[in-house]
């Protein structure tokens, strides 16, 4: 089986005045179809730089990045934008929803740039994506009419709507309390059971226990790449939490 993405000896350097910052120092790993991988690291570890490269928002200084069989490291900006819109689904910590746009319209957004998808098909796929995250009853609500957890569900639906080869999640539980975080991880685990490939960036060790594999970055180097032998079930973890009225975050 070929990997969905392959990172080979990736380096990323930034010029800061007279100094050069080595954000990534020769990192290599593969992610295969159907994997749920956590990329962990503290501030300064290089995980945000890595996510920018994985998301085709930045290019490495050297090394190879192959996504779905295609080399990306030498592509021009327009070609990278096309890859982002067709092959990648993004979920951000701050949701990044348009405030004056309904949930379903937010979910439809990635398909607006795909001329091969009709308005009717775009609407149908957005409804299906919202159903997958349990928000079909809120599709006409504006973001300010939704809770933080519901807004993140809309963001996940938006990431699903173009049927990406991989979902890239950046601290997707970072703005949520523990109960809501576990609810969101339940969705990611269910999507993974359905065959979705997920790369989830986090600095929270407890969130990493819900994935099947953890890659740890430190000082721009890959320090660990381990298979999680005891994957925690997010639904069971959620049900084990104290009731909301007794819950002390």
Predicted regions and their residues:
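Short, Lys/Arg-enriched, disordered terminal segments
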Residues: 1-3, 247-248
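ABC family nucleotide-binding domain
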Residues: 2-217
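Conserved beta-strand-loop-alpha-helix hinge in the C-terminal portion
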Residues: 221-246
């Amino acid at each position: 089986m070929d990997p969905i993405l392959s990172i080979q000896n990736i380096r990323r350097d930034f010029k800061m005045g007279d100094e050069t910052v080595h954000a990534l120092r020769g990192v290599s790993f593969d992610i295969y179809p159907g994997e749920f991988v956590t990329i962990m690291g503290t501030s300064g570890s290089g995980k945000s730089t890595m996510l920018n490269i994985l998301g085709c928002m930045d290019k490495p200084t050297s090394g190879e990045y192959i996504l779905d069989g295609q080399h990306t490291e030498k592509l021009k900006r327009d070609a990278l934008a096309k890859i982002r819109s067709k092959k990648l689904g993004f979920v951000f910590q701050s949701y990044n929803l348009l405030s004056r746009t309904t949930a379903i319209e937010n979910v439809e957004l990635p398909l607006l740039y795909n001329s091969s998808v009709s308005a009717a098909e775009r609407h149908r796929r957005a409804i299906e994506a919202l159903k997958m995250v349990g928000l079909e009853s809120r599709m006409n609500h504006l973001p300010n009419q939704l809770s933080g957890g519901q807004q993140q569900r809309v963001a996940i639906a938006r990431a699903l709507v173009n049927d990406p080869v991989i979902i890239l999640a950046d601290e997707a539980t970072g703005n949520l309390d523990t109960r809501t975080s576990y609810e969101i991880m339940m969705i990611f685990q269910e999507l993974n059971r359905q065959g979705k490939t997920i790369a989830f960036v986090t600095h929270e060790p407890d969130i990493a226990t819900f994935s099947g594999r953890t890659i740890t970055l430190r000082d721009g180097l890959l320090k660990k790449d381990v298979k999680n032998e005891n994957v925690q079930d997010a639904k069971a973890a959620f049900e084990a939490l104290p009731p909301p009225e007794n819950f002390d975050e």
